[in-house]
Amino acid sequence: MLIAAANKWILYLSQTYEGSVHDKRVADEEDLEFGADDPHRETLELLQDLGFQGYKPKGVVVIQPMKKPKGGELTEEQKTANRQISRQRVVVEHAIGGVKIWRMVKEQIRSWCHQLRDRVMYLACGLHNFRLKCRSHSIRT
């Protein structure tokens, strides 16, 4: 699980989990406190996908697409709202894509050292942030 800012900067990366683990379970285990010392924390928005259904941490406004009801359909207003949320969330998906440009992240890591997965992800996120920083400081002609 990672948290990215609107400028694609990766702010937080959880430890890696082996196998398939539900996003909400990872979020619950991380027990994050958003903006605990920020006086404007009510204005923090957490954009999350449907994998985090039911995850509502304190101190933030949760923005999540509406799930299609079982055997039903979403209204046009709900579909429009979901599209608007997706337009905002695409920044996070681009940040994840920026981390996954590194071959070692894309492929399965076969190692007896379980900490290696975490280290590879930390390094990939650090390189992603470094790349963003270099782009912002580059001289454009």
Q: Regions from the language model: what does each represent?
A:
Residues 1-141:
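Short, well-ordered secondary-structure "scaffold" segments embedded in the functional core
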